[in-house]
Amino acid sequence: MALKPDRNIVVTDISNICNIAIEKGEVLVFSVSGSGALNDDVATVTRASNPSGLVPAGLSLADMVSIDITRQHRNWHKDEQLLGEKLPLLTKGWVVTNKIASGVSPAAGDSAYLTSNGNLTDTQTSGTPKVGQFLGGVDADGYAKVFIDLPIV
């Protein structure tokens, strides 16, 4: 589980396609190609191994899964989308997530920066984009409350 149910969603974006398996709570970036109109691959989002210089698209509110729907039914009670479908992304609001880089100990008020693999950190390295602000430290289970504030693109 990468997101706890305690959250406040102000603005979401459901116009982008994701073609890789991801967990809820990961911050994704815009792919370098296209717009996504007509369900093509141009407005795709992806997980960045090095987010330096990339534009964050939002925090994933659903899991992207790769299942064979001809062999099993989709579980509509889970927050999951199939690869190649539109993905709901949080662009403004706060969530409680465990997608925090290892060894990071943020405090309330620290800026939240995107680091590798969709995780968050409180230290900015060369070119890593700011995605919001930590609203508290990491608890005993590894979760932290984070306010995401991304410009509408």
Please tell me what each predicted stretch does.
Residues 1-153:
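Surface-exposed, low-hydrophobicity beta-strand/loop segments enriched in small/polar/acidic residues
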